[in-house]
Structure formats: C-alpha cells, structure tokens
C-alpha cells in the first residue's frame, strides 16, 4: 500500500472508491434488513465489514489533507445513491397498487386480469359520484409496467402504490409467481379496450 500513500492523487481516488463500496453495501444492507431479507442482508454485511477492515483503515489514517476529506465525503454520498439504485434495479418484494376509476364501461378489472394481474375490485363513492376501486398486487419489477398499462387504459385514473409489510393468505403471491404478465403496446391496449366495449 506504500505506492498508494506516496501518491496524493492516487490516495484521493482510493479513498473515493473504497468509501463508495463501503457505503453502497451499508445502504443495501439497511434497505434489505427493513424489507425483511435477513439472510441476504447478512451476506451483504459480510462484504461491508470486509471492505471496512481492508480499506477503511487506510482511508481513516490518511484524512489529514483537505482533498482526502472531500473525497471521503463525496464517496459517502455517491455510495448512498449507488446502493439505492442497485436496490431499485433488483426490485425485491411486492407492490400494492390501488386504482380509483370512474370508467365502468372499460371493465378495467377484467382487462388487467387478461394481462395476467390479480385484481380485487369493489364499488365506492366519491364527491362526484360512484367510483370503482381496484386493488392489485404485483412484483415490484412489474410496477412501472402496471402503472403505464393503467394510464393507457384510463388516463384519468387515480393511482396510489405502496409496499405491503406482510402478505398472508389468498392466491395472490403464488398466482403472480406462476403467471406470465402480458406486455402490450399502447396501440394494442386501445384495440383490446375498444373490442371489449363493442362486444357488450
């Protein structure tokens, strides 16, 4: 490690990279722990501590120059962003999407079921009259596709998405794992809806 300590700019780069790795693992472990993935979180914590032992000792012993302190702080902030981005790409867990729509004639529940989603729907009443509320459980990796599908089917729908803490009972989780969700283009969705309306 002497060649690193002797070169000030190489030291800055080393501090920056090591802190990115360390904080990335730290952020991912925290998120995974909160989501209940305890064994994956434990595996990530092993890598986190490994980086800490191997690299952070070098980092902390060379924070005597302003450029090293800036590299440490900048690496810390970038590490948080990188960790969150990785977790977003992994898209672990499920999302519940609540949809409120006034378009009864579109038969959105069956349209979404035909696309492979599990839908529970019921009637509700708002300020401007009756509404249809749908509750949809989907893996997080399909959340964006589901949101885009709903917006294409009903651009005026009111949508809320959140992550459930616990899931128990029902066919939702197993059904979604087995079910292959269809991926239609916006033009295809419009033709499907028009065909459904004309057939009624």
Curated annotation (Swiss-Prot):
The lineage of its organism: Bacteria, Bacillati, Bacillota, Bacilli, Bacillales. It is found in: Cell membrane. Keywords: Cell membrane, Membrane, Transmembrane, Transmembrane helix. GO terms for cellular component: plasma membrane. This is UPF0316 protein USA300HOU_1913. It comes from the Bacteria. Belongs to the UPF0316 family. Its main location: membrane. It comes from Staphylococcus aureus (strain USA300 / TCH1516). Pfam families: DUF2179, DUF5698. It is a multi-pass membrane protein. The keyword Oxidoreductase does not apply. CDD domains: YitT_C_like_1 (cd16381). The chain crosses the membrane at residues 8-28, 40-60, 66-86.
């Amino acid at each position: 490690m002497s060649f690193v300590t002797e070169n000030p700019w190489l030291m800055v780069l080393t501090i920056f990279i090591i802190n990115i790795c360390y904080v990335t693992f730290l952020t991912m472990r925290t998120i995974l722990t909160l989501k209940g993935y305890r064994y994956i979180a434990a595996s990530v914590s092993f890598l986190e501590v490994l980086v800490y032992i191997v690299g952070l000792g070098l980092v902390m012993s060379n924070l005597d120059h302003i450029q090293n302190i800036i590299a440490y702080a900048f690496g810390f902030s970038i590490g948080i962003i990188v960790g969150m981005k990785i977790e977003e790409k992994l898209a672990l867990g499920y999302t519940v999407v609540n949809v409120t729509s006034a378009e009864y004639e579109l038969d959105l529940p069956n349209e979404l079921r035909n696309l492979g989603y599990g839908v529970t729907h019921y009637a509700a009443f708002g300020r401007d009259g009756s509404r249809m509320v749908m509750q949809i459980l989907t893996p997080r990796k399909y959340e964006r596709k589901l949101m885009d599908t709903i917006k294409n089917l009903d651009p005026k729908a009111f949508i809320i998405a959140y992550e459930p803490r616990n899931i128990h009972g029902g066919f939702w989780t197993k059904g979604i794992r087995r079910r292959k969700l269809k991926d239609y283009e916006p033009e295809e969705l419009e033709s499907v809806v028009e065909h459904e309306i004309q057939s009624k």
